């Protein structure tokens, strides 16, 4: 009976290692699976203690095979990472702050960094990754050589579509769900318990190049077509608008406080903004929006809250309200409007 149990454990060990190899081939990090493999191997060896040598050898042999397979996977994973690094497309990076510096470090010294006051070169090919504040985006676009504007890549929070449309651009956009704590620190991926595969996404001409760059640093990034991009783009906008506004109603609140202490307020606001976004952009969110946004909040629970960059964030929904009222219709976002007035973001 004990021998059968030990055999089953050893077999599980080998199966897990094999699955890890399959995960690696699919582009999924096998780290968690490998750790489980080693755990099961240890258990198999413990269960084998006290058995005859031949029995023990057989059990440990299976575990040794699994460990060898796990080692092969680890080696393969390193090789895949190196191959990705070799294939990274050199870029022009505008801005040398936390995000810009982190992205430049992923480029292996092949990127060209444009700092404040410098001009974007016309003769450098590849993506132009803009890592600046939103309020200078218009001037950056205008100062970019006209033949290079289609190569612009934007990583900012907020709704950029109106600006890009006004400039006649269909540029690459990235929904950044990784965080850089301070200048020079490596980025931390914003994976959640509901989305362990990661949430960062890119769409546009250089989306695949951006994904390769991020994945070389161990970060996730989905490549989406423009239609697929709309829903996660708006979900992230709703996240930052709702969490920041509810937090502003409760001074000193962190994102985690909003999620854990004021969830009812948050849920009502998220549902209101989601309905407005669906109507405005002719989309339908997948069920569970509130749960997904709260899951992300838990991964960045220490972030402070404040209503800022109004034009790019809450301004998107406030403009929807203003247009409706101008047409003699009711405000589709009455709670949002009332709370903006309450915190002083707009005039009463």
Feature locations, PLM:
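Rossmann-like NAD(P)(H) cofactor-binding subdomain of soluble oxidoreductases
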Residues: 100-107, 117-192
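Hydrophobic, well-ordered beta-alpha structural blocks that scaffold small-molecule cofactor pockets
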Residues: 56-126, 131-141
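Structural alpha-beta junctions
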Residues: 58-61, 108-113, 147-151, 168-175, ...
């Amino acid at each position: 009976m004990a021998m059968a149990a030990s055999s089953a454990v050893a077999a599980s060990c080998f199966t897990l290692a094999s699955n890890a190899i399959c995960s690696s081939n699919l582009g999924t990090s096998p780290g968690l699976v490998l750790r489980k493999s080693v755990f099961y191997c240890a258990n198999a060896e413990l269960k084998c203690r006290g058995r005859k040598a031949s029995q023990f050898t057989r059990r440990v042999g299976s575990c040794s095979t699994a460990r060898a397979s796990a080692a092969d996977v680890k080696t393969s994973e390193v090789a895949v990472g190196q191959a990705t690094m070799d294939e990274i497309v050199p870029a022009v990076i505008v801005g040398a702050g936390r995000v810009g510096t982190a992205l430049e470090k992923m480029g292996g010294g092949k990127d060209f960094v444009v700092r404040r006051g410098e001009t974007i070169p016309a003769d450098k090919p590849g993506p132009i990754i803009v890592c600046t504040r939103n309020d200078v985006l218009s001037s950056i676009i205008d100062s970019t050589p006209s033949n290079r504007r289609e190569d612009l890549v934007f990583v900012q929070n907020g709704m950029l579509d109106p600006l890009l449309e006004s400039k006649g651009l269909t540029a690459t956009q990235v929904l950044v769900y990784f965080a850089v704590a301070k200048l020079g620190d490596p980025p931390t991926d914003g994976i959640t318990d509901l989305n362990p595969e990661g949430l960062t996404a890119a769409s546009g001409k250089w989306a695949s190049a951006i994904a390769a760059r991020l994945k070389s640093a161990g970060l996730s990034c989905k490549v989406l077509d423009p239609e697929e991009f709309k829903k996660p783009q708006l979900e992230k906008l709703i996240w930052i608008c709702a969490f920041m506004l509810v937090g502003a109603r409760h001074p000193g609140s962190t994102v985690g406080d909003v999620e854990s202490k004021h969830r009812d307020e948050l849920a009502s606001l998220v549902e209101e903004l989601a309905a407005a976004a669906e109507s405005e952009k002719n989309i339908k969110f997948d069920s569970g929006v509130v749960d997904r946004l709260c899951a992300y909040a838990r991964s960045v629970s220490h972030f402070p809250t404040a209503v800022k960059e109004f034009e790019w964030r809450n301004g998107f929904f406030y403009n929807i309200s203003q247009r409706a009222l101008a047409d003699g219709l009711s405000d589709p976002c009455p709670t949002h409007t009332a709370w903006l007035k309450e915190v002083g973001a707009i005039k009463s």
